[in-house]
Amino acid sequence: MEFKGQVALVTGSARGIGKAIAAGLAQKGVNVVIADVNLEEALKTSSEIAGLGVRSEALRLDVSSSKEVTGVFEDIQRNFGRLDILVNNAGITRDGLLLRMKEEDWDLVININLKGAFLCSKEAVKIMAKQRYGRIVNIASVVAFMGNPGQVNYGASKAGIVGLTKTIAKEYASRGITANAVAPGFIMTAMTEALPDNVKEEMKKAIPMARFGTVMDVANAVVFLSSPDSGYITGQVIHVNGGMYM
């Protein structure tokens, strides 16, 4: 199957890692739906993606809302007629130590990071199973494997992503659908850029490659797992962390 001309939905793709993933797919000729809770930013990103010579559409999406998720997939079916790739990238953090964490902060992170991936995957599989082809790539985190103080909700949500991924892989391999996860480590973002230099240097000491990752380091892994070339890879977690976790 040709990669060029396929249709991808990338959640949380108005900026950051999600935007880089969308751009990476578009550079391969994939049509991309930009879905994000921030529609204004999504529209800007979609315009940039369309400038790469592919079709692109921006949709508002709160992934924790089953109604909004269903509406987005109906829109994709109506406007594109198919869906080949789903990247569950939408996610948030609400940090706090276990004893200080509010229940609503636990629920919010689980609902967006894990329930959102569940809802989107469920709708995607309905389409992909009929096509007998599909690629689902979920964004996990090194925190799912190493833990991180102050992120009990985030770590639990990303560990759940790994279990979700492996189960989907087993359930739908016979339908030509693969499901894999990418687990980023410390990635250079506006937040990490703002850290004091001494803090950044301490963080780098935990990374054998002695640098932070870039959004394109993550995007490149996602693009490969989204491609027809990855057809014999399913149920796997690809770690993109410079050797911080092995």
Regions from the PLM with identified roles:
Residues 82, 173, 178, 233-235:
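Short, small/polar-rich loop/turn modules that mediate ligand/substrate recognition or access, typified
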